[in-house]
Amino acid sequence: MAEIKILTEKIDKRELKRLVEQCFKDMVKYVVDIRQKRIAIGGELHADAEQLLLESGSEQKDIWGANYYPGKGESGCIEYTALINIRPSSGNSSMEVIDNNLQEKIREITFELIGKGEGL
């Protein structure tokens, strides 16, 4: 099983590169806890990272999945899409995070803990 790490501070660039290369080569899946402002990054499935956050104290309503693409700059590095985001009861009926305010929270935490789309 591919490694998943919980981030509470900025990830080292070498570590990010290793996580990107372990599964998809050009991107890494991650899950953000918007309340605790932490990220579970790595692995093959968003659901695995989601489970890790849930087991360590996160609440389902605060967890959203995304993909990070290094080297695509601030405007292109985040894809707000994951199966775990399908939550009709929370007003999100698609894989993509629809709410702009929620996207902004994810973006802020991503820029703080992962990066702003810089190359590796």
Indicate where each model-derived feature is located:
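Intrinsically disordered, low-complexity regulatory segments enriched in Ser/Thr/Pro
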Residues: 70, 74-97
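Well-ordered alpha/beta subsegment
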Residues: 96-120
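Short histidine-centered catalytic/ligand-binding loop motif
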Residues: 12-20, 89-99
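Negatively charged, low-complexity tracts enriched in Asp/Glu with abundant Ser/Thr
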Residues: 10-52
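Eukaryotic low-complexity, non-globular regulatory regions
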Residues: 1-3
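Amphipathic, interaction-prone secondary-structure segments
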Residues: 44-75
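Generic structural "secondary-structure junction" signal
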Residues: 8, 55-56, 65, 80, ...
